């Protein structure tokens, strides 16, 4: 008679003072929720230093201080870090990403400036950008939205048209294969249908959010903190609060010029190796702008971003 396999005892959770590994799955201010790597219950953690540099998606080492709390003592090596910045401060979005999914809608009217900046941030961090145009069932507003997005399609950006509320199955069919196995951050202005999209892709999202809110000891509204949801087909979806500004003051001029895909083939053809692509003679970018190969709105965005970057003392 074959003996039943011996059941292995569960690995004990880290005790006070012991270092353990985990992944940051939610953040609000200096409060973080860490999912232990050993599969134990999540716990609320705080950074050891006064200035926090922890982001959702970080692999961290922590020391438990009580049954459900700990201190983050080390951040693991990152593949990338997505954040926005102005002259005075920066706001971390998430770390260790593969893709950036930008949610737009036929209505309310979306900001093309924010779209352009999000795409630049994706390019600068070597993330695959995916643009979603939601609410295509609002037929009166659809032609204008398509016209505004046509230049981005021409640049090769993936633009998906869907209606999360009226055609959820189609939306899921389009998105699920693109998200499976990847770490994807969801960005968008308020009112674009981002929360509805999360609930479609993550069936237990509302319950998970309530659990995280309880762990943060808060009754905060569900969109006020960044959180990570594991996906059924592998990978993760990171939902970030809606925002109205996307400063990229931290990007150097060199990173900016390479973040415009239409600029890249031309960079080696400028007369001067340190060309700023603003008013220099023999600039291949300005020549392409003059003959219509580069859209005026895109070059204007580049000029604005260069100006913003120049305000930072490096």
From Swiss-Prot:
The keyword Membrane does not apply. One of its GO terms (biological process) is ribosomal small subunit biogenesis. One of its GO terms (cellular component) is cytoplasm. Keywords: Cytoplasm, GTP-binding, Hydrolase, Metal-binding, Nucleotide-binding, Ribosome biogenesis, RNA-binding, rRNA-binding, Zinc. It is found in: Cytoplasm. The keyword Nucleus does not apply. Its main location: cytoplasm. It comes from the Bacteria. Binds 1 zinc ion per subunit. It is an enzyme of class 3 (hydrolase). Pfam families: RsgA_GTPase. One of its GO terms (molecular function) is GTP binding. Residues 85-246 form the CP-type G domain. Its cofactor is Zn(2+). Zn(2+) binds at residues 270, 275, 277, 283. Its EC number is 3.6.1.-. InterPro entries: G_CP_dom, NA-bd_OB-fold, P-loop_NTPase, Ribosome_biogen_GTPase_RsgA, RsgA_GTPase_dom, RsgA_N. GTP binds at residues 134-137, 188-196. One of several proteins that assist in the late maturation steps of the functional core of the 30S ribosomal subunit. Helps release RbfA from mature subunits. May play a role in the assembly of ribosomal proteins into the subunit. Circularly permuted GTPase that catalyzes slow GTP hydrolysis, GTPase activity is stimulated by the 30S ribosomal subunit. Belongs to the TRAFAC class YlqF/YawG GTPase family. RsgA subfamily. HAMAP family: GTPase_RsgA. PANTHER family: SMALL RIBOSOMAL SUBUNIT BIOGENESIS GTPASE RSGA (PTHR32120), SMALL RIBOSOMAL SUBUNIT BIOGENESIS GTPASE RSGA 1, MITOCHONDRIAL-RELATED (PTHR32120:SF11). This is Small ribosomal subunit biogenesis GTPase RsgA. It comes from Burkholderia mallei (strain ATCC 23344). The lineage of its organism: Bacteria, Pseudomonadati, Pseudomonadota, Betaproteobacteria, Burkholderiales.
